[in-house]
Every structure is written in structure tokens, then in C-alpha cells.
């Protein structure tokens, strides 16, 4: 078998965010709030906006809200930025509120995917929206990025539209849509936006803004990392790129004849009835006469014949528009290995939209290739055809953006945020704590984000796809400045910082030991199936940050509200002791997600043994500190790869350890996640994809309301409402031995007269007594939203009345 040589990628570098000349003079200065109306623009002395950001969230000028980060980042570049937040989408008029932008519209659905924000995992409409004043639902349309782009085009048809945010980011290629149960086209094609920016887009949006300000047509901006755009069939600008065709699976590879070491090249050619004369003549051609790319690497590779792709299949057979030069490979005479063309000029052709829509195997294959090309150090561009014949278009996805440096992270987070919702949301008393309170802002009001990214790689999570695996950390000084700003400026601060974390609590300043190895790595996770030996797990910088933060004047307590990666934490007992002794407010959130190997392997999560090791350390250090503290584990029901027996074993583990879930999170197939590909295809993209059932790994999928309800019932085994369903299921599973009234049984034989879930619709004319905040052992919350749990029905803790068995 011939191997393919790949050179180690050099450390990444990019133009600094602060290296651009400001577009406007500094005389304007930062705005107290980015304007949301013509009147506010007039107060700032503006006659127009350079950029108008349209968002599905209410405008909160805080570094945890995407529109504020992008708006303030562009403002620091000298651009005049306006905000249109949660506009009425029934007409184009609200999109004209700030006039015609000079450069572009920036469109985003907000901090959350609009479909996940509006619908539960069971496809039921939510009654609330945490990113809207008063928590009211219905303030944004379904797939609001699409709707907003259409209205912006209707308002000002000649203004470029740049699409961003997590909703668009996770829909940049053809994707499975859980709500319609079908594969949809790239949002770039459906929306007809000019550019799509994916991931954290500060670097990309700054470059795009400055190039548009120089009057460069948006159609020519095709070389910015972290962007996607549409190429037509007749576009010749990609002629100097080299295309690797990955649009099929299980195609036979090329057979190479074994080389006779005792024959020269001329003798071998003569034995085959050919001659080396042409090859020798080609090698003697001056570089000025070589065709584009034909000898960039000399003998290492050559262009294929016209219309032929890297795997030997003719492009015409697929009806492809060949916008890049296909390549074939030959072994190097020095190493005997196949060599690829330069990665920075290589594009991989994914299966087309029409292919992945009708072929589950190709969908899983495309998902696998996409996730293998996510490391900024070695990722290649991707292209996916949408449409056929003369209407065919290519969605071209450039490699991911270069991660921000610590200095750049400090620049972004040190911008002059007001750290408050816009004054237009205040109540009659000018407060944001009344009926117009924005729940999402309330959650992060006194919290500090210290880093971005996550190298955990959990297959059900979108953080890695959006923010990347490389951790981008702020400096200690920048974090301390923000804490002091909260202390001195934010109304209602009582001395408690509610969170000092990020996507994960304990990945601050943790990185690969070698930037060269990091740039060449293609693993989807640094901690699964075990912690990579190249990962530096030193928690000392985080410990120093904790100690400095809690020593600040006026700061009484620093809590850690972000989820903890416990398999990483146990590598540093000193960190666990520091955390448990000083930074736990009674409960600490961790996410084992399950206890059984089947679902855990599909989630890429560590085994329950890692949880047990952390639990022992947690209890030991809590006892040494003289504190009564508990862990809150998160679990998911109905994840791909979960059998009914797996959920039964999880329920037994929960009962044995005294855990009772207040709420249950059912697996939610979000666009582009690996677990979603499993859900749609019944295949495991973590393994090789093949049409051969002996080579491809099938995944058990929990579909249908009845089975999903059963898996949720196992998580809430203590809820009497679920006992009839569980009894029936246990009997079918041959586990009737778990039905009984002893401690070793899972559920009893009797049924209480009342279940405790009924609530009278009649309004009570009395106020319930205040409930004490005493800690309860065994309390778990399995909602992954990060928002306050909805205390409804049986989740309120009503205890059913017991009925004696007959």
C-alpha cells in the first residue's frame, strides 16, 4: 500500500486585528450604545451607517452577545455601526430604519440557532425566549437568517449582505434539518447572501469591511479564511487551484506495478513498449513554458488529463463544473510515497447536495470529511455542488479562521461595552430588572468569559464546529480589568462573580505542547479516547487567575458556573482542591452524559470511571474544607447509540447513587453535528464510511415518540407518572425482577393515587411561602441550555401520595 506524504504545517500567522488603518478619524469616538434609530444616529453626528447589523436577539451591549462583539470590533476599526434588533419581519420597512448602509448588512440569527431557540427537542414550540425582553417568545421567525436576508434585499437590493452567527455557521453546507426531517441546501444558497462568515468572525469581518471600504466588489472577495461563497459554472478564478474529488466512497484505487530495482527507468519503459523521451523533454522545459501548476513540485505530482479527478473518475460523469484543476499523483523517486499538491491551493470536492440528499452513505462521508478539515493549521478548502446542469453552483468554503492571539482576545474583550441592555428595553423606572428583564443577560450579568474554543469534541455539541478546537485565552490582566469593571459599573453587583469560565471551565491556557504538532493534527478530540500525550494539562495559570481574582477588593466570591471537564481536572489535584475549596457555591456542574460504553463511544465522552475518580476527589476536598457541596451531573436521553438496556442501566446507577433528575434533556439533532449525521444516516462518521456493511459501523438510533419517551422515563425513574410505562418496558425486556417494593428494585408495584404533576388552572389568592435555599443531595439538572430551569409540573418537587400495595 502506497502512503501519502504530508509535510508538517508551519505555525499559523495572520494580520493582527489592530494592524488596519481606521476607516474614519477618531473624532467620532465610541458610542455609549451602538445606534438603533435615526434619532440616536443624529445625536452621534452620523448621517449614515457604514455597517448595519440585523440580529434576532435583543441588543445587549455585552461581550457575551455576538452583535455587540462584532459591532464594537468594527467600531474600533473606525466604521459607523448601527443595530436593528429583532425587527418585525412582516415587511421590509423596519429594515430601512437606519437608512442604506454604505458598505454592507451584517445578518445574524443571534446567539442561538433560531429553530433550537423556538422548538424543544420534541419539536414543540417553546413559550419563552431568553434573548427577548420579558422572556417573551415569538420575536423572531423560523430560520430567521433566511427571512432577514430576504427583507434586507427587499429594502436595499444593491447592498452586499454578509451572513454570520451560529445558525448560518452550522448550515454552511448541505445539512440535515431535524424540524423538516430532510436534507436542506446550504443556507448561503437558500438565502442568496453574498458572503457567509462562519465561526468567531472578528478577523474575517474586519478584512471584508476594509476591502469593501476600498470599493472592492464583494464578488471578488474569495480568499478570506472563515468565509463561504457561491461560485458559478463559468467562474475561472479558481483555475490555479487543484481539486481532490471526494464525492464518492468505495471507488477502487489505482494499481501500481511493483518496481524492479534492477531495471533503470529507460529499461522499464522499453519493456512496456514506451519511451521516457517525453518525460525527459518536459523536465527540461524552462519554468516560463510550464502550464499553471504543472511542475510546482517537480516530479512529486502532475496535473491529471482534462476532466479527470484525483481518484480517476471523470468529472463529466458527475456533471461537475470543473472550476479547479484536477490532479493525479505519482510516487516520489526519493521516498516512494505519494505526494499531494500544496494544501493552501487544494480544494476537496464533497458529494453534491443532490447526492447527500438521496444517499445516506454519502451524507455520512461528507460529514466525516468536513470534520477532518477543521484544523486551521492543515484544513483545505471545500466545495459542494448545488443544482444540476446550467443552474449548478458551487458552495466554496475556505479554511477556518486563524485563532486570535492573547493580545487580540484582550483587544476584543477590552472594547468599551456598556455591559447593559439598550435603554429602550428599560421599564418605566429605567431598570432592566422588572418585567422587561432579558433572561439571557441576567445569566451572564456578573460573569466573565476567559477563553474560547473547546478540544473536547463531543459529537452532539456545536462548540467545536463553531469556535474550533484551539483554545484562545485572554491575559490575566484583561480578565482582572473586566472583574473590576463589573464591580465598579454594573448595577446590582453584590460582590459575587457568577462564573469565570467559557465553553468549558478548565481549558484556560491549555494547549498542545508543540505548535507544529497542533497544526498537523487531524484528531477530532484531544481528550478522547484518552488524553493526548501531547496535550499540556497544567492548570497552574488557571489557579493563579482564581487566586488573583478572589483577592480583589469588593469581590466576595468567585463561582465557577461553566461545565467542568472532569477527566482533565483529575490530572491536576491542586486545581480540584482550589476549585472545591473556594469556587463552588454548593453545586458544581459536570457532564458524564451517560454510564454505558455504547452511547459514550458515540458521544466521544470518557467512561464513568473518570467521573468516579473526580467524585472521590471532590468529596475529599469538600470534607477537608468543611463544606457541604454536591455535584450536578448532566445526562442525555435518546442519544444515537443508546439502547433501551443502556437507559435501564443508567436508571439503576442513578437510583444507586441517589440522583433524581428535575428535568430531562433529550438528544437534539443540531445541524452539522457528528451525532446528527449518525441520527440521519444510522452510520458512525467517526469510523470509516463504506457501503460494505462489514466495514461500516451501524448505529442504533432512538426514533419515534414512544421510544424517546421511554428513554426520558428511565432518566426520571422516580416520577410516578413514568412507572406504568417503565413497568411495561421492563416486562418486555425480561427484567420484571426490577419491579418491586424493595431497595434493590427500580420501580414499585403500586401506583399512587395522585402523581403530583397536576396544577389547578385557578389562580391562588395567596403567596406561597419562601422556599429555603438549603442544598439537596442527589439533585441533577439535565438541561444543557445554560439557562434557568423551568420549574413546572412535577419538576417543582411535589411529592406523590403513596398508596399501599394491594
Residue ranges and their predicted role:
Residues 2-20, 273-281, 311-326, 750-806:
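Acidic, low-complexity intrinsically disordered tails
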Residues 58, 66, 85-284, 297-390:
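Glycine-rich beta-alpha loop elements in corrinoid/cobalamin-binding modules
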Residues 90, 219-236, 351-374, 392, ...:
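Terminal amphipathic helices with adjacent charged low-complexity linkers/tails
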Amino acid at each position: 500500500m502506497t502512503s501519502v506524504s504530508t509535510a508538517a504545517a508551519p505555525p499559523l500567522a495572520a494580520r493582527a486585528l489592530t494592524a488596519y488603518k481606521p476607516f474614519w478619524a477618531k473624532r467620532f469616538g465610541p458610542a455609549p450604545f451602538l445606534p438603533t434609530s435615526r434619532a440616536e444616529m443624529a445625536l452621534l453626528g452620523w448621517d449614515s451607517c457604514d455597517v448595519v447589523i440585523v440580529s434576532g436577539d435583543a441588543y445587549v451591549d455585552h461581550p457575551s452577545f455576538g452583535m455587540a462583539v462584532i459591532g464594537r470590533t468594527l467600531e474600533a476599526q473606525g466604521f459607523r455601526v448601527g443595530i436593528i434588533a429583532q425587527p418585525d419581519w412582516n415587511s421590509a420597512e423596519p429594515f430601512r430604519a437606519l437608512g442604506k448602509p454604505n458598505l454592507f448588512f451584517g445578518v445574524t440569527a443571534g446567539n442561538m440557532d433560531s429553530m433550537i431557540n423556538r422548538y424543544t427537542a420534541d419539536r414543540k414550540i417553546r413559550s419563552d425566549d431568553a434573548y427577548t425582553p420579558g422572556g417573551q417568545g415569538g420575536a423572531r421567525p423560523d430560520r430567521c437568517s433566511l427571512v432577514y436576508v430576504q427583507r434586507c434585499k427587499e429594502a436595499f437590493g444593491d447592498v452586499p449582505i454578509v451572513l454570520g452567527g451560529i445558525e448560518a455557521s452550522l448550515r454552511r453546507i448541505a445539512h440535515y434539518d431535524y424540524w423538516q426531517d430532510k436534507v436542506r441546501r446550504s443556507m448561503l444558497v437558500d438565502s442568496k447572501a453574498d458572503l457567509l462568515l462562519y465561526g468567531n468572525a472578528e478577523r474575517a469581518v474586519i478584512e471584508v469591511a476594509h476591502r469593501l471600504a476600498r470599493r472592492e466588489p464583494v464578488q471578488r472577495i474569495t480568499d478570506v479564511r472563515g468565509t463561504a461563497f457561491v461560485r458559478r459554472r463559468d467562474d475561472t478564478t479558481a483555475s490555479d487551484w487543484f481539486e481532490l474529488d471526494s464525492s464518492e466512497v468505495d471507488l477502487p484505487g489505482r494499481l501500481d506495478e511493483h518496481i524492479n530495482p534492477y531495471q533503470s527507468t529507460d529499461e522499464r519503459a522499453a519493456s512496456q513498449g514506451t519511451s521516457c523521451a517525453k518525460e525527459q523533454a518536459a523536465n527540461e522545459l524552462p519554468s516560463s513554458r510550464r502550464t499553471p501548476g504543472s511542475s510546482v513540485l517537480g516530479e512529486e505530482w502532475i496535473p491529471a488529463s482534462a476532466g479527470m479527478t484525483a481518484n480517476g473518475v471523470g468529472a463529466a460523469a458527475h456533471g461537475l463544473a470543473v472550476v479547479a484543476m484536477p490532479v493525479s499523483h505519482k510516487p516520489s523517486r526519493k521516498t516512494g510515497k505519494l505526494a499531494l499538491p500544496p494544501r493552501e491551493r487544494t480544494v476537496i470536492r464533497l458529494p453534491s447536495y443532490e447526492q447527500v440528499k438521496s444517499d445516506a452513505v454519502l451524507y455520512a462521508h461528507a460529514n466525516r470529511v468536513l470534520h477532518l478539515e477543521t484544523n486551521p493549521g492543515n484544513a483545505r478548502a471545500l466545495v459542494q455542488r448545488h443544482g444540476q446542469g446550467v443552474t449548478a453552483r458551487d458552495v466554496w468554503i475556505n479554511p477556518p479562521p486563524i485563532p486570535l492571539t492573547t493580545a487580540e482576545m484582550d483587544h476584543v474583550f477590552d472594547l468599551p461595552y456598556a455591559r447593559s441592555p439598550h435603554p429602550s428595553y428599560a421599564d418605566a423606572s429605567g431598570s432592566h430588572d422588572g418585567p422587561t428583564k432579558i433572561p439571557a443577560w441576567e445569566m451572564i450579568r456578573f460573569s466573565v468569559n476567559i477563553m474560547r474554543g473547546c478540544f473536547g469534541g463531543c459529537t452532539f455539541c456545536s462548540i467545536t464546529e463553531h469556535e474550533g478546537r484551539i483554545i484562545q485565552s485572554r491575559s490575566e490582566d484583561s480578565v482582572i480589568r473586566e472583574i473590576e469593571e463589573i464591580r465598579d459599573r454594573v448595577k446590582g453587583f453584590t460582590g459575587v462573580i457568577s462564573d469565570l469560565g467559557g465553553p468549558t471551565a478548565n481549558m484556560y491556557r491549555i494547549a498542545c505542547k508543540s505548535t507544529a504538532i497542533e497544526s498537523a493534527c487531524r484528531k477530532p478530540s484531544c481528550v478522547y479516547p484518552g488524553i493526548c500525550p501531547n496535550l499540556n494539562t497544567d492548570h497552574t495559570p488557571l489557579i493563579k487567575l482564581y487566586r488573583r481574582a478572589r483577592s480583589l477588593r469588593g469581590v466576595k466570591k468567585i463561582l465557577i458556573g461553566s461545565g467542568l471537564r472532569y477527566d482533565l481536572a483529575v490530572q491536576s489535584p491542586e486545581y480540584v482542591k482550589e476549585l472545591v475549596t473556594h469556587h463552588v457555591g454548593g453545586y458544581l456542574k459536570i457532564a458524564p452524559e451517560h454510564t454505558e460504553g455504547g452511547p459514550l463511544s458515540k458521544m466521544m465522552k470518557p467512561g464513568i470511571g473518570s467521573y468516579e475518580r473526580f467524585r472521590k476527589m471532590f468529596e475529599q476536598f469538600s470534607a477537608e474544607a468543611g463544606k457541604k457541596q454536591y455535584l450536578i451531573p448532566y445526562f442525555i436521553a435518546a442519544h444515537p447509540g443508546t439502547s433501551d438496556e443502556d437507559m435501564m442501566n443508567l436508571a439503576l446507577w442513578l437510583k444507586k447513587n441517589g440522583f433524581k433528575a428535575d428535568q430531562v434533556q433529550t438528544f437534539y439533532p443540531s445541524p452539522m453535528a457528528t451525532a446528527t449525521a449518525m441520527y440521519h444516516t444510522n452510520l458512525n462518521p467517526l469510523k470509516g464510511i463504506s457501503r460494505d456493511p462489514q466495514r461500516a459501523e451501524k448505529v442504533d438510533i432512538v426514533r419515534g415518540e414512544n421510544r424517546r419517551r421511554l428513554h426520558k422515563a428511565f432518566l426520571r425513574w422516580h416520577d410516578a407518572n413514568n412507572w406504568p410505562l417503565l413497568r411495561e418496558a421492563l416486562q418486555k425486556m425480561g427484567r420484571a425482577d426490577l419491579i418491586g417494593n424493595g431497595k434493590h428494585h427500580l420501580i414499585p408495584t403500586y401506583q399512587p393515587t395522585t402523581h403530583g404533576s397536576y396544577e389547578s388552572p385557578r389562580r391562588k389568592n395567596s403567596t406561597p411561602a419562601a422556599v429555603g435555599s438549603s442544598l439537596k443531595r442527589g439533585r441533577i439538572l439535565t438541561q444543557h441550555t445554560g439557562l434557568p430551569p423551568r420549574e413546572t409540573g412535577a419538576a417543582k418537587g411535589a411529592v406523590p401520595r403513596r398508596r399501599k400495595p394491594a
